[in-house]
Amino acid sequence: SDMASAPTCSPLTSPAIAQSAIAAAVAKPVSLPEMSIGSEKAPVTITEYSSLTCPHCAAFGQNVFPMLRSKYIDAGQVRFVFREFPLDIKAAAASILARCIGKDDPEKYLAAVEILFKLQDRLVAQTKDTLFHVGKMHGMSVQEVETCEKDQTQFDKLNADQQYAAQALRVTSTPTFFINGVRLQGALSFEEFEERIKPLLK
């Protein structure tokens, strides 16, 4: 029987074949444009599933991500892929706004995500006002933010990507990271990332 629903502790190392299969499943194109930074040729790919209302995700974004970026991503050793896994409608609405701001530019998108993380408490308490505020910071009118939030196609794509992550990749909580196909759940420190990245760079 399938024990996927039982609480499990994942081993840190899985057989190479399973790992490469998972890596391929993670790399499968999703419905929304891929938001990634770093070299396409980087030996390590980190894919994060994140919710904009999740405090652990915000902590990673503000404390760990800048260090990963300066040491590994900008150096061409790590490619970083940011994927949405909204845990509630507020997070979904914030993700859609970040998509409208970023369009096809991952840097603009990540800048919007960074601001939304900084304003997370406000986003949760006063969702609409915060979305308008962040939109305005990026030159969007109230009308443009409202139009963005009414785009059902975007929400459907977001939902499809989340369903795939939940079913095929067994993502159940945020943040969840995949480092070259190894799944790690929860907020990791920079040191914990480094421990896992370094052996892959040899």
Model-derived features: positions:
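Residue-level signal for pocket-adjacent positions within structured domains
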Residues: 30-32, 118, 179
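Structural alpha/beta surface segment adjacent to cysteine/selenocysteine redox centers
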Residues: 50-52, 58-136
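Extracytoplasmic thiol/disulfide redox context detector
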Residues: 1-86, 159-167, 201-202
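C-terminal cap of thioredoxin/glutaredoxin-like
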Residues: 9, 14, 19, 51, ...
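Structural motif
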Residues: 43-44, 107, 172
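Short capping/connector residues at structural and topological boundaries
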Residues: 40-42, 90, 189
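Secondary-structure boundary/capping motif
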Residues: 56, 89-90, 157, 185
